[in-house]
């Protein structure tokens, strides 16, 4: 009787092994039925797979151990590479359903966890560092990000905290940015998923790097950029996402005004000036209209003899009209003539600093 019992027990334990059938990958046809599901059939008979089967990809030392129903994944699912379990989860009627675990193909350590419902991400998904600490955490509701999105440094320091609702960013978004400067960035999103409200990026020691604001996803109002020292580097003005108004930039370290001009619809419009970085004195001045030079342009020319100002006339971006150059020292005329479509034309004259005619010629 004992011998009969042992035989029965052996057959009972061995049943799953006999029930499980192995297929090589080229013995199975896989059809995408169009709704994200895969239909598995025996290649020769075209019969849908049912029960637990092992599908082997001998070329890559990989295989899948999964349960099937009417040709679709249904039940437990495991994927191996070089006998290391790299994916484990479950399906329901061909769709991922429940917790999926993704492991490293090198050492089998847990890399990711994802929760599914009816084939869509639903619940908390996590990724892990090789140490086992959480690297990131995201929350979903039926395929759309919903809730907090968190990411961490390997030492556990929070790097990102974003908030989502039905797939859109909403509310306060915090990010730790690493680059030339390490910065803490904070921006706000409205219920429609657009940036809206105050924006700031701040140095790790607490001083601001950039301060500004958004309105319905577009930059709006004054934006200011600062140096690590706290000095202002740039002031910009925006309207509906386009630069519109005064733009001023300053030299880092000295704080000397470098450039100032006006913008309209992202194009220079109005007075434009540049300054000497050493002493802050004006060295260039022009007028723009709709992004093109239009009107007078003055440019300081520094010479090893005598510095002088050149004054040109522009019409719709082309140099047209009278030209003159005057010495800085005594405002005496240095050179005069005329331009037409960017070329010198007509009679030109040049004078010495004491007012004597030095040269006179014609330009073709």
Describe each model-derived feature in a short phrase.
Residues 18-364:
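Glycine/tyrosine- and acidic-biased, solvent-exposed loop/turn segments at the edges of beta-strands
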